[in-house]
From Swiss-Prot:
Protein name: Bifunctional protein PyrR
EC id: 2.4.2.9
Gene3D superfamilies assigned to the protein according to its UniProt record, in alphabetical order: 3.40.50.2020
Membership in a protein family: Belongs to the purine/pyrimidine phosphoribosyltransferase family. PyrR subfamily.
Protein function: Regulates the transcription of the pyrimidine nucleotide (pyr) operon in response to exogenous pyrimidines. Also displays a weak uracil phosphoribosyltransferase activity which is not physiologically significant.
Lineage of producing organism: Bacteria, Thermotogati, Deinococcota, Deinococci, Deinococcales
Annotated organism of origin: Deinococcus deserti (strain DSM 17065 / CIP 109153 / LMG 22923 / VCD115)
Catalytic activity: UMP + diphosphate = 5-phospho-alpha-D-ribose 1-diphosphate + uracil
InterPro entries: PRibTrfase_dom (IPR000836), PRTase-like (IPR029057), PyrR (IPR023050), PyrR_bifunctional (IPR050137)
Gene name for this UniProt entry: pyrR
Length: 183
């Protein structure tokens, strides 16, 4: 396999971006009371857990976290596979009294977030929903935007943003690849 075109964020830059997002969440929500973070499979989950830990550290309150599988809510399910892999959805708290922050690694077309919103609403009716992403690469196909962004990264549609996290990949980094180099 070839190498990435560029390393967009190093481990230290990922850490700083997550810390900044945590501070922005606190500022916008006037604290961390009644917040809950829900990570979208796969890399949104460790990012949500990291943000919850940072928010707890900064505000001294426990922030519940959950995980959301959007597989059955995708609008391209028939194109993905005959046997889609269904992963666990786990939201061990009542959504009704919470402001939920959905967390994902990359925001691209907006279709994943649309599916996540549908899945979340099927679980309950939160007070409000916000979106935090590590990377926003543009190319939206739906009217969706992130409330909190670690890095805005304009890309070509022939490029791929690969987020690597210590929990899933053994290292923290964000890389930019040419799509053809990944085939």
């Amino acid at each position: 396999m070839s190498a990435p075109k560029a390393t967009i964020l190093t481990a230290d830059e990922v850490r700083r971006a997550m810390t900044r997002i945590a501070h922005e969440i606190i500022e916008r929500n006037k604290g961390a009371e009644n917040l809950a973070l829900i990570g979208i499979h796969t890399r949104g989950i460790p990012l949500a857990e990291r943000l919850a830990a940072k928010l707890s550290e900064l505000e001294g309150v426990d922030i519940p976290t959950g995980m959301l599988d959007i597989t059955l809510y995708r609008d391209d399910l028939s194109e993905v596979a005959h046997q889609p892999i269904i992963r666990e959805t786990q939201v061990p708290f009542d959504l009704g009294q919470r402001r939920v922050i959905l967390v994902d690694d990359v925001l691209y077309t907006g279709r994943t977030v649309r599916a996540a919103l549908d899945a979340l609403i099927d679980l309950g009716r939160p007070v409000g929903i916000q979106l935090a992403v590590l990377v926003d690469r543009g190319h939206r196909e739906l009217p969706i935007r992130a409330d909190y962004v670690g890095k805005n990264l304009p890309t070509a549609s022939s490029e791929v943003v690969k987020v690597k996290l210590h929990e899933t990949d053994g290292v923290d980094s964000v890389e930019l690849w040419d799509l053809e180099d990944l085939k």
